[in-house]
Amino acid sequence: MAKSPVLVTGGAGYIGSHAVLALKDGGWPVAVIDDLSNGTREVVPGDVPFYEGSIADRSLVGRIFVEQGTAAIMHFAGSIVVPESVEKPLLYYRNNTVGTHSLISAAVEAGVRHILFSSTAATYGAPARIPIDEQDPKEPINPYGASKLMTERMLSDSSAAYPLNYGALRYFNVAGADPGLRAGQIGRGSTHLIKIAVEAVVGKRDHVDVFGTDYPTNDGTCVRDYIHVSDLADAHVLALERLIERPDENLVLNCGYGTGLSVLEVLDAVDRVAVRPVRRETKPRRTGDPPELVASNRRLVETLAWTPRFADIDVIVTHALQWERKLQGLTAE
């Protein structure tokens, strides 16, 4: 198929930067817009056109569409920290929902036909059954999940009214780093468990907090479905191809491995990979954390013929730790 120009919003961020690499590796023309509030310019390859700014800047976005001949959008820009969303809900509705409204409006006006959206398992809230199917009730329990669900609804309504199709990929817990260490999670004050744990391994932290040990799970800690960021990036490219090939079809797909790991099981993996234990401290539950989130990925596998390459927690942790050590070396220079 012809590979049309793609605009990646939030392409200097963690997941977006890996999507940029996957697109480039696949021969897609790609450009990036990022306001650098959470992203890092250095992870965007030097030959990729980069625009510093907000997706809410209609004039800038419109200019990018013209200059790059944009045919499709991969949309990662937004705020993503669950506890912060509870403290600052209006920030999340502005950055995630209102910002995407502006982006969709600009796309419709310019005739950009395909949008692939970075959604989340947080749209499901605290699910009644595991694994979670895409058709299960969406009852988010924090503003982050609610803001993403509102965006999905905007995309659905827009696709019914305008010549536009969309995909919403509902991520579970994304971790790891590009195996070639071209990109990884940089994060300022990260709340991601594996990122925090490998920071502790290299001495950036002296311990890892375990939030809640009284959940109704095997060991009392939260259970999550961890997916390697490069496997997720591959899923994005496959989903984009599907949207372009089938312009009358929309996609809503869970992105996970369908396997749950508890906080303690993940920390055990970190200890194995690091060959030494990381100190743990037990803390009360965090507001907005459901006990268990595990995907049914049947539709993802069947619809996109997606085959993960890194579906092993030790591999995920190894790549995350290698990236963290690279960051530590860069900081020391």
List PLM regions with ranges:
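Glycine-centered small-residue hotspots that permit tight backbone geometry or close packing
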Residues: 11, 39-41, 53, 83, ...
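Aromatic/hydrophobic pocket-lining residues that form π-stacking "cages" and hydrophobic walls in ligand
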Residues: 103, 155, 197, 239, ...
